[in-house]
């Protein structure tokens, strides 16, 4: 499943396709999707397992400031000076713009190169020169070059894990001696959590399930993991 799916849709899918287990591979910040998947499994009595991305150790990167959510990150950014690059997508951009008092700090948004993403940046009041439309994840060297080009003094990113390129951003910022604002993942009480695809497969077979009867709730960022689990 790689599209928005409400509870009723997921329940119908489970019933119509004889699903016996759900593997939740969604983005760490897709909390509502995970909650819906767990609820659907509770309602139908089938197995649920969360494939969680590795958590980064912020202590490994100098200059990292952790915040519990987007609101806290926006308040922190509003107190900074210079140029802050936001690498958080477009959904929460208005929070950062609303918290800012005046033109400082300068906000530069790095977003996906989709017309809708760019349009939403412009609608928020960002100037074209403050919009970087690129699809990552990128290497440390690429991030370094981008931060230097835009004169970035702080970068804001989500705790998306290595697969989302968070480590490369933090490392690039650390090498340049600039601040990093790291937004922590939402805390959910997952019923069962696995760290690797192999652990997921072992769990499924221990539950008497096979990947053939398993629904994979996924997003594009974790697609390679899902392909592995189908072998």
Regions found by a protein language model. Give the residues of each.
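Anionic-ligand binding region
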Residues: 82-130
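Short acidic-hydrophobic, aromatic-tinged amphipathic segments that line or gate anion-handling sites
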Residues: 1-4, 63-71, 192-203
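Glycine-rich, highly charged phosphate/nucleotide-binding loops
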Residues: 1-14, 132-142
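A C-terminal functional module that forms or caps the active site or interfaces directly
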Residues: 122-145, 149-154, 159-176, 181-183
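Structural motif
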Residues: 20-21, 83, 153-154
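Glycine/small-residue-rich loop that forms an oxyanion/phosphate-binding "nest" at active or ligand-binding sites
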Residues: 11-73
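A short helix->loop->beta-strand "cap" motif at the edges of active sites that frequently abuts
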Residues: 42-49, 105, 175-179
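C-terminal functional extensions of proteins
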Residues: 147-150, 154, 159-162, 166, ...
């Amino acid at each position: 499943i790689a599209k928005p799916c409400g509870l009723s849709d997921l329940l119908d899918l489970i019933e119509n396709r004889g699903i016996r287990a759900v593997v939740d591979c969604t983005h760490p910040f897709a909390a509502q999707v995970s909650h819906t998947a767990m609820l659907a499994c509770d309602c139908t009595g089938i197995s649920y397992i969360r494939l969680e991305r590795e958590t980064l150790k912020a202590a490994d990167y100098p200059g990292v400031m952790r915040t519990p959510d987007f609101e806290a990150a926006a308040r922190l950014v509003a107190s900074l000076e210079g140029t802050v690059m936001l690498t958080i997508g477009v959904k929460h951009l208005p929070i950062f713009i609303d918290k800012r008092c005046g033109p400082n700090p300068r906000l530069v948004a790095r977003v996906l190169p989709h017309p809708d993403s760019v349009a939403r940046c412009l609608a928020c009041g960002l100037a074209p020169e403050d919009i970087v439309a690129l699809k990552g994840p990128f290497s440390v060297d690429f991030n370094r070059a981008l931060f230097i080009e835009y004169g970035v003094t702080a970068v804001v990113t989500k705790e998306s894990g290595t697969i989302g390129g968070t480590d490369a951003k933090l490392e690039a910022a650390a090498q340049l001696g600039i601040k990093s604002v790291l937004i922590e993942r939402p805390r959910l009480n997952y019923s069962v959590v696995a760290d690797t695809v192999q652990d997921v497969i072992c769990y499924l077979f221990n539950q008497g399930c096979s990947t053939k009867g398993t629904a994979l709730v996924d997003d594009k960022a974790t697609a390679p993991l899902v392909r592995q689990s189908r072998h």
